[in-house]
Every structure is written in C-alpha cells, then in structure tokens.
Amino acid sequence: MRNIKLIIEYDGTAYCGWQVQPNGRTVQEVLQEALAAMLGEKTPLHGSGRTDAGVHARGMVACFKTDKAMPLRAFREGLNCLLPGDIAVREACEVPLEFHPRFDAHAKHYRYTILLDDLRSPLSRLTVWRLKGKLDIQAMRAACAAFVGEHDFAAFRASNCAAKTTVRRIYSMDLVQEGCLLHLDVKGSGFLKNMVRIITGTLIEVGQGKKSVEDVARLLQGGDRQQNSGMTVPPQGLCLMQVYYQEKCD
C-alpha cells in the first residue's frame, strides 16, 4: 500500500467549499470522482482542512492510499487530464503510510487580498474583494501585532462554528501593499470557521478609524461574536497558500 500526497490548486468560485456535502458540488467530490476514474475504484481523499464556498487554494494538501504501482508523475498527469480547468494537481509525492494531511499539519498560511480602488476590476473580481476609500495602513499593521501569539479567538469565528476549543496560535500576520492590492498574510497553527475573514473585517474597521488597537486586544480576551468584532468579509479574496509539516512530510 502507498500513501500519495497531492498539492492542489483550485479556484473555489463554482464550489460549495472543499469538503463533500449532500447539497452542492465540492472540490473534494470532484477530485474523488477523478481518482475513481483513474484508479478504477472508489478511493477516499483526505484533505488538510476545509475551505468555505468561494474560497481558493494554491496549496491544499490531500492524501489517498492505493496499491497501484504507477509512477508519481502518472498520478499527477492522469488526474489533471480528468479534472476541470478550475482544479489542478500541482505535485504528487509518496509519504509514509502513517502521514495524515490534517492531523500532521504544523501550520497554515492564508492570504486575503483587497483591491483598494474606486473602480471595479472585471479581471480580478473572483480573486479579490474591492474596497472603496482610504485605509490607515499603519494602524492596521499595529493591530496585526496584537493577534500574534496564542489567544482565544471566540470573537473571531462564525456563529455556527463547532470547534471544541477556540484557542489558536498565530505565528505571524503581515500586511503587504502592492500598488492597489493589499495582502493580509496570516500564518497560524489552525483556524476557526471564518476566522481569517473576520480578522480581516476587524482590521479594515481599524483602518477606517472605527476600531482601535485596544479594541482588538479586548476582543482577544476571551470574547464572543456578540462583542462587535469586525464584519465577515466576502470569500473570494481568501486563498489557502500553503500547509506546513515537520519531518513526516518534509
């Protein structure tokens, strides 16, 4: 038996998220159908986590087990021949049988991209969120520092989030401006449902002068969603960039 690890890139616009669900097409479902067609049998595919409807990925990690003696390149190319144009396998490699893409993940890097422009951009509308008006970028950067470290992120999760614990560790959070584009790069141990999108909404309110760095600090002191954290920004600006592992997959 072999454990095959895939690095997957996808445009999440047309999908109801990553995970298979009864009502709506998902990325995992499409990949499992392609796997079944290639291998001639139904094969479960386990991902490193979930992305919500409309969210994209450059570095989703998933694994499947097979006894097929195919070269690694054949797995990648075979799947890409069967997948639609908005999903692609970027890499395929063999990892130890005990490796699990979710449970062995050490950290994840998400990026949220905002277009700071009064004019809409038809070519980028599916991968950025356009925001009119000016932002105080320096104030937003100061607020980013408050998120770094281990905190209770109860105030930064969706109301239907079912996570057993709301404590997470943020390793780094940076704002990078490239012309009209503003990227929020967040690297953390894990994320609650809608957490990055709510953090982004909170930072925007800091940039608009509606919240202060002190307000952010108070929200991180074990608050809940009713404590007026920021809005949940739209999904299209969010992208899973990379999942990090230690020795089991390096």
UniProtKB/Swiss-Prot annotation:
Gene Ontology BP term (one): tRNA pseudouridine synthesis
Alphabetized UniProt keyword annotations: Isomerase, tRNA processing
UniProt superkingdom: Bacteria
InterPro entries: PsdUridine_synth_cat_dom_sf (IPR020103), PsdUridine_synth_TruA (IPR001406), PsdUridine_synth_TruA_a/b_dom (IPR020097), PsdUridine_synth_TruA_C (IPR020095), TruA/RsuA/RluB/E/F_N (IPR020094)
Reactions catalysed: uridine(38/39/40) in tRNA = pseudouridine(38/39/40) in tRNA
Pfam families linked: PseudoU_synth_1 (PF01416)
Gene3D superfamilies: Pseudouridine synthase I, catalytic domain, C-terminal subdomain, Pseudouridine synthase I, catalytic domain, N-terminal subdomain
Enzyme Commission code: 5.4.99.12
Membrane-crossing residue ranges in chain numbering: none
Subunit structure: Homodimer.
NCBIfam families: hisT_truA (TIGR00071)
PANTHER family the record matches: PSEUDOURIDYLATE SYNTHASE, TRNA PSEUDOURIDINE SYNTHASE-LIKE 1
UniProt record similarity statement: Belongs to the tRNA pseudouridine synthase TruA family.
The protein's role, per its UniProt record: Formation of pseudouridine at positions 38, 39 and 40 in the anticodon stem and loop of transfer RNAs.
UniProt-recorded name of the protein: tRNA pseudouridine synthase A
Source organism of the structure: Citrifermentans bemidjiense (strain ATCC BAA-1014 / DSM 16622 / JCM 12645 / Bem)
